[in-house]
Amino acid sequence: MKLRDLCFLTLLRDAMAGTCSTEAATLAKSMDWTLENQVLELAQLHHVFPLLAQQLLLLNPPDLRRDVLRHWAMETLARQAMATQALLVLTGALEKAGIPALVVKGAVCRSLYPSPDLRPSSDEDILIQPEDLPVAEQVFRSLGYCLQSSPEDSVQIWYANPLRVELHCSLCGSMTIAGQAVQPWFDACFSRSISWNVGEGTVRTLAQQDHFLYLILHFYKHFLTGGVGIRQLCDICLFAGKQQANLDWSSLWTELETLSLACLTWNMLDLGIRYLGLDSRAVPKPERIPAADSEDLLQDILEAGVFGSSSLERKHSSRITLQAASAQNRKAGTVRAALFPSASDLQSRYSYLQKNPWLLPAAWCARCFGYLREGRNLGVRAASAAKIGRQRVALLEKYGILNCKI
């Protein structure tokens, strides 16, 4: 393992536990300015910069830019604390209007960390029932929120400084895995919902079993496309460790096997056990689940950045993995597939395609200009995207997610 990655994972593990280990202290003594920069750049890529900044401030390695790191950490703390307060005001207003609203991921996951506001969230996800949408929209507008997406979108995006909210009427929509519709697993989630302390107050959220399964499905969704960052894995490991008494692992493994996600999940948890401080006793594994082989998964996660956003090539490679997973195109691992996806594949990024699919060539041009703006040859970038796509499809095959080859 690269020294950069070892330092990154060690500091992150300690931040999740609220400790400074002897191992981290030893590594810190040998860190020079170059290595510190590399570790912090990786932390920035994965949106865990404040967590690692705090650890470095505690360890104080040579050449540390203390003033810069302290400023970043304090700024994040203040911004995140204000966003959490705004969330509590919003959920309180929804409740007062008679709307059951469940906060998912975000604030709930942050509360698992020793210093919750150092785990940044770019937005908050709120789940409501479809029949409550008109009244919910009135509540958002009454609090000064502006709708930043089309009213017809399946997920509405609302913003009022300092809070950005994704408003959902369905957790999984039409998502299917291994031929199974996922949404029915959550049809009764409102009746099972619980109250959750997020530090400054309480919110309603999914029951622990529902929430943990949803975190895994959310990991899978991003893993299937451009890749998933380390922060999501941290959330899952902390949830598994701190909520072990409220998780029925026998039922979870059965559900995950039905969805062909048991192998991937166990390899995720194995990384948590080996690198992120997860107690193996918190996640009992049935003997029928194959032994973990998770190093390739770790490298894919480290290279991906948050939501697979580390590079344009990786973003564009998602078309290859999606097509392979749906078995619609067994020759998807080509330069053409990376450069010229279908209109339906690009609608989420270029919203004008939803009503005007004939503008698809314009979207292709926009993608190509995106490559060129980063200053590299278009063909080289497309070939690189195809290569990443093929490598990632091999990972999907390894963890039992698909059986087709490209």
Residue ranges and their predicted role:
Residues M1-S122, I128-I406:
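Conserved NTP-donor binding/palm subdomain of two-metal-ion nucleotidyltransferases/polymerases, i.e.
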